[in-house]
């Protein structure tokens, strides 16, 4: 459950390390975002040599949330942190590598490139 002002780790090598959610995409009254949802983020920490600089505004997809998520088969999944991957307008990741596990629900939201780059899909 990600809302405005939530800080997330970045799970790719785009150069950003920490971002803050500034908008949940999908309606003016939408408050929360979950796994597979696109949010607008502001970069709070970035590597000095990266293309993405501190203070820039990007779009990102959520790949891990620490709040447990109930799947249709009745099982629950929960991660240790909140993490996202910075994407472009065509749902392709800006980085070339993904760090850490990602949720299987990304496959249902058509983020196949992220799923194929991830070292583990849970």
UniProtKB/Swiss-Prot annotation:
Keywords: Ribonucleoprotein, Ribosomal protein, RNA-binding, rRNA-binding. The keyword Ribonucleoprotein applies. It comes from the Bacteria. GO terms for molecular function: large ribosomal subunit rRNA binding; structural constituent of ribosome. SUPFAM superfamilies: Ribosomal protein L14. Binds to 23S rRNA. Forms part of two intersubunit bridges in the 70S ribosome. This is Large ribosomal subunit protein uL14. It comes from Treponema denticola (strain ATCC 35405 / DSM 14222 / CIP 103919 / JCM 8153 / KCTC 15104). The lineage of its organism: Bacteria, Pseudomonadati, Spirochaetota, Spirochaetia, Spirochaetales.
């Amino acid at each position: 459950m990600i809302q405005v002002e939530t800080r997330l780790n970045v799970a790719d090598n785009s150069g950003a390390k920490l971002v803050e959610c500034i908008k949940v995409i999908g309606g003016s009254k939408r408050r929360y975002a979950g796994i597979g949802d696109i949010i607008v983020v502001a970069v709070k920490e970035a590597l000095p040599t990266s293309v993405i600089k501190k203070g820039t505004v990007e779009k990102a997809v959520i790949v891990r949330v620490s709040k447990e998520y109930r799947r249709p088969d009745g099982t629950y999944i929960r991660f240790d942190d909140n993490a996202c991957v910075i994407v472009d307008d065509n749902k392709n990741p800006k980085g070339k590598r993904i760090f850490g596990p990602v949720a299987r629900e990304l496959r249902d939201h058509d983020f196949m490139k992220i799923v194929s780059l991830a070292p583990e899909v849970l």
